[in-house]
């Protein structure tokens, strides 16, 4: 429990965004072949930080930076095995090898990011595994954060506290800019007393997520150095 609100260190937040320590969807990631393959641990008894919402945040950052996420393929509900009874990971490695070799052998004039998308194997499908029956089944569906789909039924994704408080799915704001609370922003109706209490709790204001990060930081490039060498160092 944290008894009072606190702010992240301003310089550390800015550096994290500028250096890509907080994942940026453009730059090198724009031309990277991405297979996001994971087991589902959102319902783990003691909780698990590896919630699948984060893969959708990555997808949102790719789309924000590049206008698409066609270089990313998601599969959920996999089993981490190489045997005939549990072939998931072995199959994924074969698909990745095929994808990377096709990119390497592409001698066209397209830039790398376009080559990555153009050479994605047709057999590398997006979907989820239904492990509920005697025979496992791959359900071929685009993976989405919220949808009326079989995969979302099997593997529901849950928002982070920040997303629940109004942040975008990209979840890429470290320190928000503040504005005065407005009771009309909420789905419930406040009494005058409750509105006064809301104002009293958030004396400094609440997040205005539409304004982006308070630092106004922008990604500076890949493999940036923190020094002391001046070579490729953060500005």
Predicted regions and their residues:
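C-terminal His-loop and adjacent cap/lid subdomain of alpha/beta-hydrolase
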Residues: 1-235
